[in-house]
Amino acid sequence: MTGSLIMLRVHKRKFLVRTTTSIAAAALLLGGIAISTTSATAASPSAIAKGIALAKSRLAEYTKLPTFTAPGAPFNARKIMKNKVIFSIPVNSSDQFVQTLENGMAAVAKKIGYKFIDYQNSGSPAQWVAGMEEAISEHVSLIDLLSGINPATLAPQIKAAKAAGIKVVSSDTYGIGQPSDPILNGTVNAPYGETARLQADWMTVHSNGKGHILLIGSSDVAASPFGIAAEQSEFKQVCPACKVYTIDVPVADWASETQTQVQAQLQAHPNLDYVSPVYDSQSQFIIPAITTANKIGKVHIVSYDGTPFVLGDMQTEKGSIVQMDVGEDLEWVSLAIADNEMRIVGGLPAVANEEIPLYLWDAANVNNAGRPPQNNKGYGAAELTGYYKLWGLTK
């Protein structure tokens, strides 16, 4: 894996621990795993209750099926995209998450009537360079760098594309509000900060404001510091009595290090209530650690992505291990990417937030995702009507 070259955002990857806390933070290094600790403060019962109430109020919105909020002004998509071409270079075509987004973007292109090229590759930077060169030679309208390609690794090619009048956009890589590479013409950002805050809110409520929590970041992912900082900040606000430990296991080390490190943390901190990886696919290496420690029903997993196999674990275990997972409709994400990129192609103002909604999956509603769970199932279909109307489509 080329972790140093890729800003990963896919179903088997994602966050970092470089944050410091305003309370008391201790950092050390054990076996190459960075560890930080946020100590609980002496919070009064009223402060704890206030935090729980605030967390509950923030969670409530995300227990309802998503509704559509227009991210920007309406426009005539077919007029703007006539004779236009979008060339998408995904981080790795073999990843199910990435290919689902590509398929959704291709469906939008077919509906609107413009050409969409999905540049298949296996995650090699050399292939990304070749894709950029092909896009430039074909004089496309916009190049989409999807789901984690670091723009810095393609700086010469991006400059050449822009010199040729081609716009270059990074999609589903940066979090909303996170600074992006200025070499880009635009971005389509993901709600990474909000997902992190929701995880903190959930663990606050379900630990009665006194949780002992292990966060797991992955330092080879660009959005990691952003998400971890958001989660730490939320705990400080809603759970002053919580004790939060944070370790870093790079994606490249997930298979070899996660179980060992989680087992070590369970032994070092026997009162742990939650293990919370920023990306839910890491749970496949966490569940064995919880099982080996005989902590099923005592230590739960809370995470983000709504990955089908993780929701399947939730169904099988009835929430006894994976308790909650923040999900997003990948069809909605595809439509959001297409929306902002069409705006950029047409010279319209880009939108900073595509209003991609989130939805909380738990044991009470997870069967709505299908048995077995499927991408895009259980979220409703408000996005199709909403975006089609926004784009001036009558049929």
Residue ranges and their predicted role:
Residues W128, G186-I213, P225-F226, T258-Q259, ...:
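Hydrophobic alpha-helical segments within soluble ligand-binding/sensing domains
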Residues S147-K162, E231, P250-D313:
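Hydrophobic alpha-helical
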